[in-house]
Swiss-Prot record:
Domain topic, free-text comment: Composed of three structural domains: an N-terminal zinc-peptidase domain, a central helix-turn-helix motif, and a C-terminal GAF-type domain.
General function of this protein: Plays a central regulatory role in DNA repair and protection pathways in response to radiation stress. Acts as a site-specific metalloprotease that cleaves and inactivates the repressor proteins DdrOC and DdrOP3, resulting in induced expression of genes required for DNA repair and cell survival after exposure to radiation.
Region (Disordered): 262-281
Compositionally biased residues, Basic and acidic residues: 267-281
One of the record's GO molecular function terms: metal ion binding
Result, substituting H86S: Radiosensitive
Lineage: Bacteria, Thermotogati, Deinococcota, Deinococci, Deinococcales
Enzyme class name: hydrolase
EC annotation from Swiss-Prot or TrEMBL: 3.4.24.-
Regulation affecting activity: Protease activity is inhibited by EDTA.
Keywords carried by this UniProt record: Hydrolase, Metal-binding, Metalloprotease, Protease, Stress response, Zinc
Designated name of the protein: Radiation response metalloprotease IrrE
Disruption phenotype: Deletion mutant is radiosensitive.
Length: 281
């Protein structure tokens, strides 16, 4: 018989502590550019080099952070913040002790990686910045676009951070055109699909990656016209079910950033829920 899984509060407490570490570290930085991010790590050097499929690594024995020089700048930036979070975590004996008490093996490694993502998000996207954008723009596609731009991170990274700070029941999504598989010559036609999705606390489902967005949906119309669009519409679940929502779609280059504000009382799934909890990428 295996031991019961640790209660969710253990991970929640660890995430809260990781955010505190990142916020404290970030408060002492002169800026958020690449070299300023390293300012608080005495004796640790930063090296960019080709790393194949790896984004980066932190080597505490040799006091060096390695970043893949062949990936996009915004990915390098998030990876750097992730590796800095590894250094911060290793410097907190109490947090390390708590983690080893609660987890072991592969699960311990998974939790550590999760915490370093939490730390990276808190470092690059401080709560004050997110709250300011939510105050100015509300929980909208525009807020998501502004967060990604001002924090200089990918829209996918931004949507998870924005969802965590959003109080009302809202689903966020990054959508882009993708070519559908087709056995005919020239391949299939392009279709707007969900690339990533996350929801605010209390919303037990989100949109699966690859979910198609109908051509007449506000998100598709916004991308087609290159104009922001906000109106009453629906969440287009892959199952075909449509949940009423106020849709705010903000087109940006070849993608559209979308928020789905759910009606009050619809944040909990019912017996005919459209998507499995956590079904996202």
């Amino acid at each position: 018989m295996t031991d019961p899984a640790p209660p969710p509060t253990a991970l929640a407490a660890a995430k809260a502590r990781m955010r505190e570490l990142a916020a404290s570290y970030g408060a002492g930085l002169p800026g958020r550019d690449t070299h300023s991010l390293m300012h608080g790590l005495d004796g640790i050097t930063l090296t960019f080099m080709p790393m194949g499929q790896r984004d980066g690594a932190y080597d505490p024995e040799h006091h060096v952070i390695l970043i893949n020089s062949q990936v996009r700048p915004e990915r390098q930036r998030f990876t750097l913040a992730h590796e800095i979070s590894h250094a911060l975590l290793l410097g907190d004996d109490d947090l390390l002790s708590d983690l080893h008490d609660e987890y072991e093996g592969d699960r311990l490694e998974q939790v550590i990686e999760t915490l370093c993502n939490v730390g990276a998000a808190a470092l690059l996207m401080p709560a004050e910045l997110i709250d300011d954008l939510l105050t100015r723009f509300g929980p909208t596609g525009r807020a998501l676009a502004e967060l990604a731009r001002r924090a200089d991170v990918s829209a996918t990274s931004a949507l998870y951070a924005l969802a965590e700070r959003t109080a009302p029941p809202v689903i966020y999504a990054v959508c882009a055109l993708s070519r559908q598989e087709d056995e005919g010559e020239g391949g299939g036609a392009k279709e707007l699909t969900v690339r990533a999705s996350s929801a605010s606390a209390g919303v037990k489902y989100s949109l699966s990656a690859g979910t198609p967005v109908p051509d007449d949906h506000p998100a598709a119309l916004a991308l087609d016209t290159r104009l922001p669009l906000a109106q009453d519409s629906y969440v287009p679940f892959r199952s075909g079910r449509r949940m009423p929502a106020y849709v705010d779609a903000f087109p940006e280059r070849q993608r559209v950033l979308v928020s789905f504000a759910l009606p009050a009382g619809r944040s909990e799934p019912d017996a005919d829920k459209p998507e499995a909890p956590g079904d996202q990428s």
